[in-house]
Amino acid sequence: MRPQSAACLLLAIVGFVGATEWWESGNYYQIYPRSFRDSDGDGIGDLNGVTEKLQYLKDIGFTGTWLSPIFKSPMVDFGYDISDFYQIHPEYGTMEDFERMIAKAKEVGIKIILDFVPNHSSTENEWFTKSVDSDPVYKDFYIWHDGKINNETGEREPPSNWNSEFRYSAWEWNEVRQQYYLHQFAIQQADLNYRNPAVVNEMKNVIRFWLGKGVSGFRIDAVPYLFEVDLDRYNQYPDEPLTNDSVNCPDPDDHCYTQHIYTQDMPETIDMVYQWRELVDEFHVENGGDKRLLMTEAYTSFENIMTYYGNGVRNGSHIPFNFDFLTSINNASKAGEYVEHIKKWMDAMPEGVYANWVLGNHDNKRVASRFGVQRTDLINILLQTLPGHAVTYNGEELGMTDVWISWEDTVDPNACNSDPDNYYARSRDPARSPYQWDASSKAGFTSADHTWLPVADDYKTNNALQQLRAPRSHLQIFKKLVRVRKEPSFRQGELNIQAIDDDVIIYSRQKTGSDLYVIVLNLGSTSKTLDLTKYYELGTQAEVITTSLSSQYIDGDVIKSTEFVANPYVGTVLVAV
């Protein structure tokens, strides 16, 4: 083995402990319920639709599924604006439907993880209504401020220059209370005040409630926004400094126009994550059963992400999502960039925790659209053969692509706050189109004539049923990957990875005493003939476990290790024979 890989190999051993609990080295599937399966014919996915398809997920081999928000909501931000944290959204079903889903999940052996949205509530939440009325219990449940008077005009203005993620001021005037409230997302999503112990306790009660209903954990949304800087001695909030980026962010209404040093990543945020971990651990001790899981969503600095795991004294998130492949890698990235980001994560992890890899979600363009349809299998091979946890967004296993959605049909508030010329770049709707189950009307998603978002045009040739029936398909490759990922060398084996040129990544996975696997990924547009024995003790021959649809090889082929052909955009998993 080449000396340059030795450090990575050693760190893989340190950072990748032996899997013993259900969640360790898990394979997780994100369901966007509104688009997954509609059971009642209203054009909107629901819980009974999820229940109906749990066996499908189990047959693929997933450990668990996390559901985007299912709680009662006005649906301004499609569930991320919660009006009652203790109720199911009526379009999705009833509490009885939820309990039936939990029972079915236990029957088939798949874990249910809920999306927990702690930063804000809907302005239609009873808490907010009472806060507007200055109810003594709820008066300080949200971030309220009088604003400031403009010395030149004499008019009242927002307290600071903070902008919302969805553009424009993050402060909204309330006529009843005669104050501004903070909303870091939509106007209808009021930020909760985590400096108020009553808020902290209430949100812990929400966690306890759903744990009591039988969920196996939570994916925690938008964690960096939990706390804002405290008021200064003059009872004011400071303006954030400008980014002064006239090229990438010239519009003063955009969120990127300021540096978010007062509205994100406050030190108290990490402590809150640790408190939630203590809560779920205590629940496990008190109630038994399997351990409960915390995943965290935080688009933040790499250094911050590592603190989410824990600080050596207190534990934090089991899975602080690794978004490097979303934020730092694209279809033009070279092989060395992939390897650099993989090594960076593996090198930095605290001892005794697991890596994780997130390649897609409901907030980003789909994998096949970002990296190219021709790389669909290659990217899934990468995801499923790296150490640690794999997180798949619904539809990526089929190679679903983004759907073009007109300005008139756009419903995402992030895009709707833009204009007809710029909305599409901001819109998250294209990645949220209905799941493509079969070639029947509306892709088998619904019996309705209309769906909440348009169905993709290619559903008749690209759907789950067609791919299940085909001898070779994206889904068949994905299923093979999930199966082989359960082998000891993938669950507990060493990682030895390198880029041999700008296009080709090669790495091995092996546990002592178990099979040696070699993975070859050719990101480029030209074939490469490789002598794999120069890099790994593979022997003269190797067997193809699985490979991309466009490969010249098929599963089961025995190839010469010294003359392996890596076709363009093809990934291949090999095992020594």
Swiss-Prot record:
Gene3D superfamilies: Glycosidases, Golgi alpha-mannosidase II, Oligo-1,6-glucosidase, Domain 2. Keywords: Glycoprotein, Glycosidase, Hydrolase, Signal. Residues 1-19 form the signal peptide. It holds the Pfam family Alpha-amylase. GO terms for biological process: carbohydrate metabolic process. SMART domains: Aamy. The active site is at 221 (nucleophile), 297 (proton donor). One of its GO terms (molecular function) is alpha-1,4-glucosidase activity. It comes from the Eukaryota. It is an enzyme of class 3 (hydrolase). Glycans are attached at residues 119, 151, 244, 315, 331. It catalyses: Hydrolysis of terminal, non-reducing (1->4)-linked alpha-D-glucose residues with release of alpha-D-glucose. The record marks 363 as: Transition state stabilizer. Its EC number is 3.2.1.20. Belongs to the glycosyl hydrolase 13 family. This is Maltase A1. It comes from Drosophila melanogaster.
